[in-house]
Every structure is written in structure tokens, then in C-alpha cells.
Amino acid sequence: GVILVAGAAVVKFLTAGLVYSAKDLKSTCNLPVLGTLASAAARKAVKLDAKLNKLEGRPDGSRDDETVRLIAATIASRAPKADRILVTGDLPAEQLSALTAQLQAADTLRSRKLTCAESVLVSSTAVLEVNAADAVVLVADCSCSRYSSVNDQKEQIARLGKTVLGCVVYE
């Protein structure tokens, strides 16, 4: 019985097409990963789940502040002349806003204007923001983002004449 339940869970996960890891997202969507941050679930994980996350090399939240500074420095070095940077993805607005605020607070991006917007696949405002941006950063969360959605966003941004600097992944 346990094997059937586990097997059904694996099949459901695979058919849902959810992003599994930053490494898989990089290879599947051909997107550079700017950094990985702990998802809400990873921060709450205890005992066996926390141990499994550690074995898989997933972040636990203890280094998120340093990782955000590293992501900000990477963005600044990849787009040295970008004054206006858009952070976008198919995440809840609060999560996008919080990440944008953290990046904006980093020394390397403090002098630049960072904005956030919903996915370009569902928001006309996001399309306008992409057009106004000098650089675009995608954000994905393993708990809700799908490979197809991330890839479609990347392609839509390219059709709008912009390139995606990379992706921040919540694991």
C-alpha cells in the first residue's frame, strides 16, 4: 500500500510539471540560475524533511541574506548599465515584492530602480514593465512554478526584445 501511494505521488508530481530544482530548471529552460533561496516549506521543514532537503543540497534559509547579496552582485555585474531592473515570475505578489525589496536594499543595487510585476503571461502591466526595463530577472518557486510557464515567460520576454539575466529559484 505504501509503495502505491508513493508511486502515485511521484506520477502526480511528474505529470504536474512543477519545477523540481534550480539545476533542473537551468538544464530544462536553458536559463542561468542567479541563486537559490529557501522556500517557505523548506524553512518550516523539520526532522526527516529537513534531512532530505540537506541531502539534496536545498537551502534551509540560514544563508538567504548572503545569497540575496550574491544575487544582487551577480545582477549588477551582468547588467552594469541597467538602471531599471524588473523582477518577475508566476509567484504570489507578496513573495515577488519581498525579494525585490531585499535586492533593492543590497549595496550593489541600491542606486538602481528595481520593480516587480506578475508574470508576463497574465499581466498587461508586466508587459509594459518589461518594455520599460533595462534588465529582467525571472523568479521561480518549486512549490508553484512549472517548467512550461518559466520557459513561456522567457520566450515572451525575448519576443518583447529583452533578455532574461537569469532566474532566482526558491527551493
Across the structure, where does each feature detected by a protein language model lie?
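Short boundary/hinge segments that flank catalytic cores
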Residues: 1-112, 127, 141-171
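Short gly/ser/thr-rich secondary-structure transition/capping motifs
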Residues: 117-121
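Inter-motif core of Ras-like GTPase G domains
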Residues: 123-142
